[in-house]
Amino acid sequence: MSPAAGVPELPALDGKGLRLAIVASTWHETICDALLDGARKVAVGAGIDDPTVVRVLGAIEIPVVAQALARTHDAVVALGVVIRGETPHFDYVCDAVTQGLTRVSLDASTPVANGVLTTNTEHQALDRAGLPDSAEDKGAQAAAAALSTALTLRQLS
């Protein structure tokens, strides 16, 4: 996997003692499974061997499950994919998911990393999924962002 332009190296993280949850949708299974694999690898690399993983059907279901997980975890990673179609549904789903995850994070004071891909094509999603031929691994990036922010919040407490 060659890095995309402008993407920083993922930091080394010591997440031992952090409770991490990952909520991932199942639409576009190959992509979502790859995102989940990337997030799990970052968790294990940070010393979190068994993050809580919850699967939901689609992206629109992710925020409410993230909300429940934010009550009992130090960080939450949201993973899924929404691919533009021929109707405005794409815009509604993307807006609802983004606003929902942001609200959950702020209301719970818990980092909720948005690793929900919003792309025009399936090819664009595959290129960001962390597969062997992908340019990026947004699952890994989202997990690193969630854990890094949780560690920052812990230092600020």
UniProtKB/Swiss-Prot annotation:
Active site, renumbered: H89
Example of a GO MF term: 6,7-dimethyl-8-ribityllumazine synthase activity
Residues bound to 5-amino-6-(D-ribitylamino)uracil: W27, A59, I60, E61, V81, V82, I83, N114
Catalytic activity: (2S)-2-hydroxy-3-oxobutyl phosphate + 5-amino-6-(D-ribitylamino)uracil = 6,7-dimethyl-8-(1-D-ribityl)lumazine + phosphate + 2 H2O + H(+)
GO BP term, example: riboflavin biosynthetic process
Family recorded in the similarity comment: Belongs to the DMRL synthase family.
Descriptive protein name: 6,7-dimethyl-8-ribityllumazine synthase
Record-listed (2S)-2-hydroxy-3-oxobutyl phosphate binding positions: E86, T87, R128
Entry-linked PANTHER family: 6,7-DIMETHYL-8-RIBITYLLUMAZINE SYNTHASE, 6,7-DIMETHYL-8-RIBITYLLUMAZINE SYNTHASE DMRL SYNTHASE LUMAZINE SYNTHASE
Pathway where it operates: Cofactor biosynthesis; riboflavin biosynthesis; riboflavin from 2-hydroxy-3-oxobutyl phosphate and 5-amino-6-(D-ribitylamino)uracil: step 1/2
HAMAP family the record matches: Lumazine_synth (MF_00178)
